Amino acid sequence: MTHELTYLLYAAILLVAHCLIQATFSDLSKGIGWALGPQDEARDQSVFAGRLQRALRNYLETLPAFIALAAIIAITGQGTETTAMGAALYFWARVAYIPCYVSGVPVIRSIAWFVSLAGLALMALPLL
């Protein structure tokens, strides 16, 4: 398996973990009765749960680009050291982004986000 596909697998695992953590803290902050019910009415959640939700939404905004780039690189066989480094940068920056966002660290969070975009750029440039 290519480096890019390996990091795609890691990104999928991160997505599942992120969803589980976010859902757990959201349910805890809203109450077990709400979590087990139809959830028709909106309820306030804790700051922590809200940050987890926004961090997940942010991850979902960049993940499709990563999936597409990793797939194109694997299918076309155009993987290079640069694309592998881009995949690693994207993944590890996204891992770093979660605790930075949840703990409210603004500057480092933004740096992690930019590094993840730089990783996507490193993956895309050799394909052009």
Label each residue range with its predicted role:
Residues 14, 57-72:
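Core segments of transmembrane alpha-helices
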Residues 118-128:
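Hydrophobic alpha-helical transmembrane segments in multi-pass integral membrane proteins
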Residues 10-13, 56, 88-92, 111, ...:
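Hydrophobic residues within alpha-helical transmembrane segments
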Residues 1-21:
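Long, highly hydrophobic alpha-helical transmembrane signal-anchor segments
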Residues 43-64, 100-102, 106:
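Membrane interfacial helix-start motif at the N-side
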